[in-house]
Amino acid sequence: MYARLIAEKLLNHKLTIATAESVTGGLLSSSLTDIAGASRFFKGAIVAYSNELKKSLLNVKQSTLINHGAVSRYCVREMALGLMQKLNVDIAVACSGVAGPDALENQAVGSLFFCVIVANKAYDFETKLPAGSRNELRQLFVQKILQTVEHILSEIS
C-alpha cells in the first residue's frame, strides 16, 4: 500500500528515489519495483551488507564504523549521503538494523535505523520493533520505512 502511494507522489512530482540497504537485503527496493512503471521513478539500489561495501560503494567512513557501528544513525546517514552522490537521485533511503536471531553491536533484535534524504534535508529515524522471526522483522522494517517515506513525501508536497 505505502509503496503504491510513494510511487504516485514520485511520478506526480517527477522525482527519483534509490535505496541503500543492509538489514533488508533488497526487500525495500523490491517493494518499490513491484509497482508498474517503477523505471520512471526508481533509479536503483545498493545492497551493502558488508562493512567493506558500505565503505567502498557508499563512502561510509571507517571511523564511523569503529566509533558507532554499522547499526547506527551515523552509519545510515553516511550511507544515504553516499547513495545521493553515487546515483544522483532526488530521494535517498538507507537502512541498517538487527533482524536476529542474535543482538549485534550492542543493538537488540528488532532495532532499526534509517535515514531519508529529500530536498537536501536528512531525516534520521531509530525504532525498536518487537522481536519476531528474522523474515518477519525484515518485512516489518520495510513497512515501517515505506510508511515513513510516504509520510515525509506527504508533508513536502
Curated annotation (Swiss-Prot):
Which residues are connected by disulfide bridges in this protein? none
Question: Matching SUPFAM superfamilies, A to Z?
Answer: CinA-like
Q: Which InterPro entries match?
A: CinA-like_C, CinA_C
Describe the family membership recorded for this protein in Swiss-Prot or TrEMBL: Belongs to the CinA family.
Q: Which NCBIfam families match?
A: PncC_domain
The entry's protein name is Protein MG115 homolog
